[in-house]
Amino acid sequence: MASKVYFADFRCPSWRENLQQKLARLMMTAGFGDIDMDGKYVAIKMHFGEPGNMAYLRPNWAKTVADLVKSQGGKPFLTDCNTLYIGGRKNALDHMESAYVNGFTPYSTGCHIIIADGLKGNDEVAVPVEGGEYVREAKIGRAVMDADVFISLTHFKGHEQAGFGGCLKNIGMGCGSRAGKMEQHNSGKPFVKQKLCVGCHACAKICAHGAPTFGPDNKATINTDKCVGCARCLAVCPKDAIQCLSLIHISEPTRPEPIS
């Protein structure tokens, strides 16, 4: 049986209801009020955005959700896990600073931020995945697992490997610790089309693990032993010389060994 999907557009034909009030009504209509949150820790999982990036949900939406949680006696907190790649969210201190710069403060959202996998991204819980095909034991940020109630507050976006990312990515990849993310990316390691590479070294500058190397001809190659499959190099290559093996050979029957 298909699930009911509730939708609200951005139109506000009446001054009596703004967009935040509309979101609150949408959530209550969908059954939010039936969830027992009294005295419970409620994780609101979202993406705080990299510094300089505008493609994230505004803090106003987080406040609407947090206020509803508190109205039902819950203790909300915003959360996300650290990233594999270079940027403003690789450790908890930088991650929280990035969130504050982008407006996610306790005063604007009505609740605090907890980076789920800790200071260095290694505070995790191993969660068995029954019937897991690629990952049989997922490494999840501890604060996510410690929460009593979990809410996914997701923005829709394009993705270099998957085409687009939404709620499943926000939870599946976003709740993974740094090691958990590495395992999920493991089958998607990139390679360089030598004839397209111009030796600009953009890939080397963005890589946090020193995977790109350059030969006498100044052409890049990827050291797969060092590569974690985060795909940041794909995004920065100006000539699209770096491509993902899992996308090029997606129709081939070979699959990576499951990670236990």
Enumerate the language-model features and the residues they cover.
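N-terminal basic/disordered segments at the start of proteins
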Residues: 1-33
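Metallocofactor- and cofactor-centric catalytic cores in central/energy metabolism, strongly enriched
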Residues: 3, 7-14, 50-58, 228, ...
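Ferredoxin-like iron-sulfur electron-transfer modules
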Residues: 12, 177-235, 241-251
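N-terminal glycine-rich anion-binding loops that anchor highly charged ligand groups
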Residues: 34-45
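Histidine-anchored nucleotide/phosphate-binding helix
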Residues: 55-72
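Residues at the starts of beta-strands that form the adenosine-phosphate
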Residues: 74-77
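An acidic, phosphate/nucleotide-engaging active-site surface
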Residues: 85-165
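Single conserved hydrophobic/aromatic residue that forms the stacking wall/gate
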Residues: 248-260
